[in-house]
Every structure is written in structure tokens, then in C-alpha cells.
Amino acid sequence: MSNTPIELKGSSFTLSVVHLHEAEPKVIHQALEDKIAQAPAFLKHAPVVLNVSALEDPVNWSAMHKAVSATGLRVIGVSGCKDAQLKAEIEKMGLPILTEGKEKAPRPAPAPQAPTQNTTPVTKTRLIDTPVRSGQRIYAPQCDLIVTSHVSAGAELIADGNIHVYGMMRGRALAGASGDRETQIFCTNLMAELVSIAGEYWLSDQIPAEFYGKAARLQLVENALTVQPLN
């Protein structure tokens, strides 16, 4: 046991950054409501950082903060702020001004090429080949998510497509986050805290005992969550 009451450690977290391109709070509120409706499992009540670097017109920060908070999103900081007056307003509300890492200079656009004939469509996939630790949230928008390592309890995987976990799955897995009921979850070792497909979910104690800790495949059948062995 440590002899000191606190201990400071470096850590990293996965957060969504909302880039504001409009200074009118009502417009931002409606745009966020629409975005949350598309992927409620990922965005509802999510912690976010607001990036204000693209704002050119003056903004009523108090009204903007209320508009964002009214959607259920939790503003934990602001980035991209260069205006001294806006900085003062933000800090007065108790929100930290966050400094982002330096961005790489954009590469010049490649010269246009003639379209290739008979091109085979490619399905996008997000691949994670490192362990997903407690507190991490990984989202794969409009694609499948593949994790080739273990997922700790307290971690969260979210994908608009399918989820594949080739390791011990102890966290939460939410496939079909944007409502696709044809998506599936594949695990080589199912010990999840929660599994969900298009909003239909099981908590850990609802997973049939014969599949717990086993290789399993989950999908919706007649709008009900089902599980079967993964062969």
C-alpha cells in the first residue's frame, strides 16, 4: 500500500472532438441532435472537447455551452482557441483550454488518375492490434472493428458495423451503433460486461452460461439477441 494519499500518473483517453463551424448556438444544437440520433450508443452523454479554431464570427459562449450541454453531451474542455476574449469567457466558466499536438502539414493533392476498370469494392475496417485498456473507448464509424488483442473490463468497443475480438473480451461491445440490425459480434473468449447489437443488449449475467468464456458469435434473430458457438 502506498504511503502517500495520492499518486500522479500519466494516462491517455479516447475522446470525441466536436469542431464548431458555426457560431449560432441553435444551429449547433440541431446538428448535434441529428448526429447523436445516428449513433446514440456512441454519442449519448459522451464526454467531448469543443474545437473552436474554425469560428470566424463572434460567439456567445454561454449560449453555445448551454446549447451543446442541452443535447446531453458533456463538455470537458475547449481546444483551438486563439481569441483572448473568448479564452477569458471559457475560463470564467471553469472549462480548461486544451492544447493539441502539432498537426502535420497537409500533403499536396495527388495528380488525378484515370479511373481503374473493374475495381473491386473495399469494405472499410478499423484494426486495433494492441490491448484495449479499462477506460478506453474505441469507435469505428461506418465500418467493422477488429481487435487482435485482449479487451479489459471497463473498456468499450463501438462500431457501426461488425465487431471481431481475437482475444479475451471483458469489456463492452456495441455493434450496429447506427442501427444496422444485420451486424454481428465475434469473440474468441466471451467474458463481456455488455454486448449490444443495434440497441438490443445483454449484461454479463444474461449471457448464457455455456457460452461464457468460450468462442461465440452473437447476432439478432427475429429482433432478439442470440448466441451460438464460433467454429
Swiss-Prot record:
<dbReference type="GO" id="GO:0000917">
    <property type="term" value="P:division septum assembly"/>
</dbReference>
<protein>
    <recommendedName>
        <fullName>Probable septum site-determining protein MinC</fullName>
    </recommendedName>
</protein>
<dbReference type="GO" id="GO:0051302">
    <property type="term" value="P:regulation of cell division"/>
</dbReference>
<comment type="similarity">
    <text>Belongs to the MinC family.</text>
</comment>
<keyword id="KW-0132">Cell division</keyword>
<dbReference type="GO" id="GO:0000902">
    <property type="term" value="P:cell morphogenesis"/>
</dbReference>
<dbReference type="InterPro" id="IPR036145">
    <property type="entry name" value="MinC_C_sf"/>
</dbReference>
<dbReference type="GO" id="GO:1901891">
    <property type="term" value="P:regulation of cell septum assembly"/>
</dbReference>
<dbReference type="InterPro" id="IPR016098">
    <property type="entry name" value="CAP/MinC_C"/>
</dbReference>
<keyword id="KW-0717">Septation</keyword>
<feature type="compositionally biased region" description="Low complexity">
    <location>
        <begin position="114"/>
        <end position="123"/>
    </location>
</feature>
<feature type="region of interest" description="Disordered">
    <location>
        <begin position="102"/>
        <end position="125"/>
    </location>
</feature>
<comment type="subunit">
    <text>Interacts with MinD and FtsZ.</text>
</comment>
<dbReference type="InterPro" id="IPR013033">
    <property type="entry name" value="MinC"/>
</dbReference>
<dbReference type="InterPro" id="IPR007874">
    <property type="entry name" value="MinC_N"/>
</dbReference>
<dbReference type="InterPro" id="IPR005526">
    <property type="entry name" value="Septum_form_inhib_MinC_C"/>
</dbReference>
<dbReference type="Pfam" id="PF05209">
    <property type="entry name" value="MinC_N"/>
</dbReference>
<comment type="function">
    <text>Cell division inhibitor that blocks the formation of polar Z ring septums. Rapidly oscillates between the poles of the cell to destabilize FtsZ filaments that have formed before they mature into polar Z rings. Prevents FtsZ polymerization.</text>
</comment>
<dbReference type="Pfam" id="PF03775">
    <property type="entry name" value="MinC_C"/>
</dbReference>
<keyword id="KW-0131">Cell cycle</keyword>
